[in-house]
Amino acid sequence: MNHSTLEIFIQVAETQSVTQAAKRLGRAQSNITTRIQQLEEELAVELFVRGNKKMVLSPAGVQFLSYARRILSLAEEAKQALHPTTPGGSLRLGAMEATAASRLPPLLTRFQQQCPQVDITLITQPTRQLTEGVLTAALDAALVCLPPGADGQPACPAELAFTPVFYETLMLVRPQTPGPLRFAAFASGCSYRALGERWLAEQQAAVEVHEVNSYHSMLACVASGRYACLLPQSVLSLMTLPENCLSEPLCEATTQLIWRSGLSAPALSEWRKLL
């Protein structure tokens, strides 16, 4: 088992395809297939369930994927630790859609100017999925809105560290004409969605959620006169509010940066300083 074999395994797991993994890595398909077979022989388990032209992870493969990501992350951290004054390598960052749209553009520009040797990648997902990504080492860090725990403090998994970085005013956008409403929101796992559903449940008996993929789609739903949505003021200020809609502050929310406790990669340290 070596570094390149783990990279191959992760790519096949993420794409569920030997063909796509080969394209990403610039390798021959036969080489990808052989390396996966060798890895399975070494581990004495089947990592994939082969069928229907897809390479789907087996239960053992799902478990091993988390370890593979952590091994590569630790190897990268060790490499960077040898050159602590010159951040390099990669930084895999996750963020909520709102944060990526309204907060990150100038910060990413500044970070690349200060750390040109760092290869930074960004993905956008809801808070729950981002938290899982950091826990499994698929991400180095993520900007999320942690839900409150029983004590009112952010409910952060014990394996993670966090710090507050942004404070958002969440705006409720709804039609001017009163009446029963549905709620337009991102997929389950979004903290803002949970807050919006709670508000709507206080207003009416039934709560029906329509899932969308963008804030523009949310506003389009509200403009139809049958939906409400919740979005940060920082995002709403970048958009045009439909004429037949009104907006009002509903609550405050905090955006936190989360990362695995003990992770001390120079690139991550520089990103934390920037925030």
Please tell me what each predicted stretch does.
Residues 42-43, 64-85:
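Alpha-helical linker/hinge and terminal dimerization helices associated
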Residues 40-57:
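A short LG(V/I)-centered, amphipathic sequence patch enriched
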Residues 10-28:
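Short helix-boundary/capping micro-motifs
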Residues 181-204:
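Secondary-structure junction motif
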